[in-house]
């Protein structure tokens, strides 16, 4: 298994992750909420900020899809504060790492770069695979996405913990 790497932070002791999908009402907010919780559990919330957005603007200001919210609630997460945002040029300057949920989102973001990756590049089971969009399917699709997101979030936290500069000059909390 290869170990995914992430770029060093632009500012020592501060790291910002942005998660991007199409409409910011299903996959990326699920990723944001789960990763933020894992970051908090790891004691990194003082150093790591997590946000999400969509490449399209259809849902800006809306809460997440009720099926995504239901899946999160059933796993013990609180989705109530999420409001959809659209990707804008400032996201590239403000985030140390942007994670696209699928290849189409990645293409909308200009393709891979040092700071733009696929979300599942950090998945030990299927590195580089897409997170399928559950929007046009049933509830099981949302639970499947949540399983993927949980797995990737654990890997990302481990990567954040070992990346020099994330938590300060030495990389230690």
Language-model regions, residue ranges each:
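Conserved active-site segments centered on acidic
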Residues: 2-93, 158-172
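Alpha-helix N-cap/helix-start capping motif
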Residues: 29, 102-103
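Phosphate-binding/catalytic loops
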Residues: 2-5, 97, 103-173
């Amino acid at each position: 298994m290869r170990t995914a790497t992430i770029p060093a932070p632009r500012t020592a002791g501060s790291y910002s992750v942005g998660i991007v999908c199409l409409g910011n009402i299903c996959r990326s907010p699920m990723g944001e909420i789960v990763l933020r919780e894992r970051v908090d559990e790891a004691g990194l919330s003082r150093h790591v900020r997590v946000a999400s957005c969509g490449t399209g603007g259809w849902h800006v200001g809306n809460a997440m899809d009720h099926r995504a919210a239901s899946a999160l609630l059933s796993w013990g997460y609180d989705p109530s504060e999420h409001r959809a945002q659209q990707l804008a040029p400032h996201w590239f300057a403000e985030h140390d790492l942007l994670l696209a949920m699928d290849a189409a989102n990645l293409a909308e973001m200009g393709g891979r770069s040092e700071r733009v990756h696929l979300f599942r590049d950090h998945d030990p089971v299927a590195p580089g695979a897409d997170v399928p969009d559950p929007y046009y399917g049933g509830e099981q699709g949302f639970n499947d996405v949540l399983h993927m997101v949980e797995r990737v979030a654990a890997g990302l936290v481990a990567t954040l913990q070992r990346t020099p500069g994330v938590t300060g000059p030495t990389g230690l909390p």
